[in-house]
């Protein structure tokens, strides 16, 4: 099969999924009157085969939600270089002074910032459709291949974007919450230290301590096993006069993001994507300090196979992207021990 760019097929597949419709093999193919080999031997049949394969791929992606999207700002630009620098502006420094006759207005200034380097990486995977699949008209097997391909891509994206939080280094600095807040924020000349908040008396108190250290935090990255205890703690967090506490005003059930991790087994080798450990959660300030740079998303092409291995065609997908993250700052993230 000649190399085919899947752009048109991608548009069709995503449109069908968005409209909650399905795309199945034709009745002729399912009944055996026409084999898949015969189908792809014609121009129209080849196009339908590509559309069906691409649909299965995107159906697989739909089955693995991208849970990180609430946390990151996305920058899509085909002109992104492999390596780029991002300059974070320092604080805006402004002071109001009394204006005397003939005097000048004092203009504000930008404080010193931090320059960071972002490297974009290429992530790729391939699947192969064998001659046996076509000879025996195994349409269900080809659909499984496409779905697994899409699932694997979304699993990778969740892993890449959530690892900076889950795999970050956190410490309990200082003797009290006030000291931890100072350590978390640091300065532009001297970076902060991402904080670990210890369990204190009960869950609402612990969460309240966390908000004192990271006041701008609005999202909790959690293990699914902890959802109900967290929801109960948030719902019951009230002051003596029954008015909602800081915790209840700051959080709702929709602010809890579950990630238990994932595993992918390929050729007998297991790849593990570590999730949030039950008993810990991460309070995060979304967007500002967490950016994903996307040169291009999942690009999928097919090419000639390998006759010596009876591979009819190979389908390769790849994406080029990078991340900029900063957890140790006032707009970053902290880790919270919620287990008594």
Please place each PLM-identified region on the residue numbering.
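Internal, hydrophobic cores of structured domains that mediate oligomerization or house catalytic pockets
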Residues: 104-126, 130-132, 140, 146-153, ...
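Alpha-helical scaffold segments that mediate packing/assembly in large oligomeric complexes
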Residues: 125-210
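Assembly/oligomerization interface modules of large self-assembling protein complexes
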Residues: 40-123
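Sequence/fold signature of self-assembling virion shell proteins
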Residues: 231-340
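A contiguous, surface-oriented mixed alpha/beta subdomain in the mid-to-C-terminal portion of proteins
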Residues: 169, 176-182, 196-252
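Intrinsically disordered, low-complexity terminal tails
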Residues: 1-44, 339-340
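Glycine-rich, charged/polar anion/phosphate-binding loops
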Residues: 113, 204-208, 300
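Short, aliphatic-rich beta-strand segments
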Residues: 125-129, 219-223, 313-323
